Amino acid sequence: MRQNTIRGFTIPELIITLGVAAIILSTAVPGVSTTIKNNRLATRVNDIITDIHFARSEAAKRDVRVILCRSSNPNSSSPQCSTDSGNDYTWTSGYLIFADSGTAANSIYNAGSDILLRRGQPAPSGVRMRTNPTWNRNLEFNPNGSIHEGSTAIMSICDDRGKEDGRQIIVSLSGIPKMYSDNISTCTPAYPDT
């Protein structure tokens, strides 16, 4: 005679298994969130550093000033550089890279005479990008690759975690960018100690 064996979990076994799974998930989910935020910041920093290298090399290649300017409409059919006279210092909306080859050479993108080289996309949600006064509206590269402004340019890229997890890009007078991620001084380089 065959005896049927019933297989399955008892209620206490099921409750214990679900409890262990809940504990594991409660420790893993915040780690995944941190990884996503770190990757979001790293991707943005890498994109900007790549574009800085691109702008610098194009200035040397074309023998003209190449400008990376902030823009509130980089994906528009007629994009423009931000021309506000205030001290906004925010670059989250995107930017343009263009060869200032027109007769005006005025650091303002003019579709009729300047050459649009690249459009920088807006920052991902939750990512803030702020600069110091040197880099306020634009970062200009001379044909020799140096920055036009004559002082170090700084951009801080942070999220809701603040400066402890933020990144900074510092462009030296020679035009070479470097990224810093350990204990950056501020998320708003235009206003020290904030």
What is the meaning of each model-derived region?
Residues 10, 19, 36:
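Conserved, well-structured beta-alpha core segment at the onset of a catalytic domain
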Residues 12-15, 89:
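Residue-level "hotspot" positions that anchor or transmit function at local structural transition points
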Residues 1-11:
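N-terminal leader/signal peptides at the extreme start of proteins
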Residues 2, 27-42, 46-49, 53, ...:
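N-terminal helix-rich module
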Residues 7, 18-21, 144, 174:
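Short glycine-rich loop/turn motifs that provide flexible caps or phosphate-binding loops at active sites
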Residues 14-31:
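Alpha-helical hydrophobic helix detector
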